[in-house]
Amino acid sequence: MRARLTAVHVLPSPNIWQWPELYAVENRAQDSTGEIWRALRAECDWRGLDVVDVGCGDGFHLPVFAQDAASVTGVEPHPPLVERAKARTRDVDNIRVHEGGAQRLPLSDGCADLVHARTAYFFGPGCEPGLTEADRVLRPGGALAIVDLDGAAPPYGRWLCDDVRGYDPVAVQRFFDEQGFSTVRIATVWRFERRADLEAVLRIEFAAKVAERAIAETAGTEIPVGYRLHVRRKPTGIILL
């Protein structure tokens, strides 16, 4: 058994690190009909199991897992968000939150049945150190579940591709295919209480030009947003090379 505590380089999140209160509004709007949770449950049910949420932010998703998991551990590299996550979950007995990055999880070998990451770190090529760490902390048969935005699903995916120079959703999908993941595409709706909240969220998600175009192309208080759920299980037996 060993724990990884070595410091690693962490890229700042362009939204939740700078605007945590507004990102909380975004979190509440996302997946308004629960499609991601249903797909995740179908692919890797966590009832009675030990769950790790990598890049847990302010802990928004931790209580959902904790409702029927044996234990839930949130790992987050940004100290202010670690404190927010601890405050959010202080009264939930089976949740723990640690400071750390995906490349060096502060956890022991074989301590988890499910490692979950939602729009955090695992964005395609370059995340291999995190994949290795997830395998290290997973027990045999455990699952790594990565929820990421689907850059091929309009309208949000089109805005994403226009905003992030060099982003290629086909190449991202090829990467996860080659790494042995299965993929489920999920159609969701972000539903905001106020139009002003929708516009403010788009302005923290995209650079000004793309944000204003996205606002102009969106009527009302809802945005269709596609996701991809990538799942890979750790082998249970001896691997012959």
Q: Each predicted region: which residue ranges?
A:
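A short acidic, Gly/Pro-enriched loop at the edge of an enzyme's catalytic core
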Residues: Q103-L114
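Conserved class I S-adenosyl-L-methionine
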Residues: M1-R47, F60-V64, A143-R174, E205
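Conserved Class I S-adenosyl-L-methionine
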Residues: D58, D177, S182-L241
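A short glycine-rich, Lys/Arg-flanked "PGG" loop and its adjoining helix->strand segment in the class I
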Residues: E128-P140
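Class I SAM-dependent methyltransferase SAM/SAH-binding core
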Residues: V52, G57-R104
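Nucleotide donor/acceptor-binding cores
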Residues: G48-L49, G110
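A short SAM/SAH-binding and catalytic strip from SAM-dependent methyltransferases
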Residues: D113-C127
